[in-house]
Amino acid sequence: FLDLQLNATEGNVSGPSVGNTSSPCEDMGIEVEVFLTLGLISLLENILVIGAIARNKNLHVPMYFFVCSLAVADMLVSLSNSWETITIYLIANKHLVLSDTSVRHLDNVFDSMICISLVASMCSLLAVAVDRYVTIFYALRYQHLMTGRRCGAIIAGIWALCTGCGPVFIVYYESTYVVVCLVAMFLTMLLLMASLYAHMFLQARAHVRRIAALPGYRSARQRTSMKGAVTLAMLLGVFIVCWAPFFLHLILMISCPQNLYCSCFMSHFNMYLILIMCNSVIDPLIYAFRSQEK
């Protein structure tokens, strides 16, 4: 997806870009400082998120463990883009000399990190959606259904899956089937999460009225669950906005690579990378502002 070798050999130090030199449209150059600034902000924010959850025992619950997984994925995509930007700059200015083979391997590592982050983000968001669904609709059985051990197994499974999928997607990126598989995974998970949230928000009020009369039921717990669902719906919305251009780029790359309009859209790949990094910056802000609401 990204072409580190192309950027370095052409002396383009305005950030990583896609290897699409045939586009008749001018590429939108973005300065190195923009990538590095966003990467640093995202890294610090997500470290604070993970640290806050680790230190606050009240947050040692499945939902926040899944949020930690999402924060790690956000850190990974920011680190990969920042690291690649620095590498491009060093190679272009002759501060770092590598063989073509080494550059290609390094490029694959960066791209794999982005794919791993993507799959981990999608799976973590889905895990949180399922957790909120169980919390709201199976409140009395939640502690039994979502145990700490089960939560840990889910997170381990998520990262095992994404660690395996990421390199495969990059090694076989020229295969149309691989790109279609990645896009299909994205759309399927979005559809599933949207269905869960739609069902939650449409049925939650009626469900609450039915169980509110049960002995020992506390309305505050339900409000907290709904608050968590709203927060994660916001995270999902930001994820869609920030990652959708990247996936549209992939779709156009295999469906109409020679079309003028498609080529023009794909020539702005740097901007789509910036949007992806913005997602990593915005997520911790959502955690912070939503946690302050009563």
Swiss-Prot record:
One of its GO terms (cellular component) is cytoplasm. Glycans are attached at N7, N12, N20. Residues 1-29, 90-106, 172-178, 258-265 are extracellular. Residues 54-65, 131-147, 204-231, 290-294 are cytoplasmic. GO terms for biological process: adenylate cyclase-activating G protein-coupled receptor signaling pathway; regulation of metabolic process. InterPro entries: GPCR_Rhodpsn, GPCR_Rhodpsn_7TM, MC3-5R, Melancort_rcpt_5, Melcrt_ACTH_rcpt. Keywords: Cell membrane, G-protein coupled receptor, Glycoprotein, Membrane, Receptor, Transducer, Transmembrane, Transmembrane helix. Coiled coil: none annotated. Receptor for MSH (alpha, beta and gamma) and ACTH. The activity of this receptor is mediated by G proteins which activate adenylate cyclase. This receptor is a possible mediator of the immunomodulation properties of melanocortins. Belongs to the G-protein coupled receptor 1 family. This is Melanocortin receptor 5. It comes from Sus scrofa.
